[in-house]
Amino acid sequence: KNLFSGSDPYFYKSLLVTVIYVALSVPTAIIFSFFIAMLLNTNVKGKGFFRTIFYLPTVVPIVAMAAIWMWIFNPDMGLANNILKAMHLPVSTWLSGESSVIPTLVFINLWTTGSTMVIFLAGMQDVPRQLLEAVEIDGGGFWAKLLHVTIPMMTPTIFYNVVMGIINGFQIFTQSYVMTQGGPNNSSLFYVYYLYREAFEFGRMGNACAVAWVLFLIIMVLTAVIFKFS
């Protein structure tokens, strides 16, 4: 009752922040990992090495990864702003700015898309070569093969990655806990971090359980809707 009555504004704030993050991170990660998978699906020399390089970040502990990105995006002495200064470009507040923290976290999320890339790569290798050759015979180029063969044949793979991306997006926690602590001004107060604060910082276990159930229902409904209209 306390959650939906509006007496706790952080509930709706955390929900909105998480929805915005999911809406930005899922399409970005899907497009980026699909593009990388396409590059690695070509007959490029040393593609096994590049596949390993792109997948390795997924096995790095998130806490260690967060520490590295905090140094890179430090607004005072971070690598990113030093590069911008060297190029005579305006610097950014990155994780310290209300308007820039979510886009920065979306960019950081691309670091962990190696598993999505591997799944896309496996799906691309299952696309029948005969269909691609038939498009070439009919005079079709790269875009014709991509739009009329590759993407339609990979619909189940894309669907799986979208569903998993949404689920993982709503469960984001470590980045907020380690890198921003929900700040600045609660602009990165993600839903699961809000749940954590309710349970372990404020001791409101009843509220935390209700928040967890709402998260379960949101993910279940979104998954059902995607199944329905996919």
Predicted segment positions?
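A structural signal for multi-pass alpha-helical bundles of membrane permease subunits
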Residues: 1-230
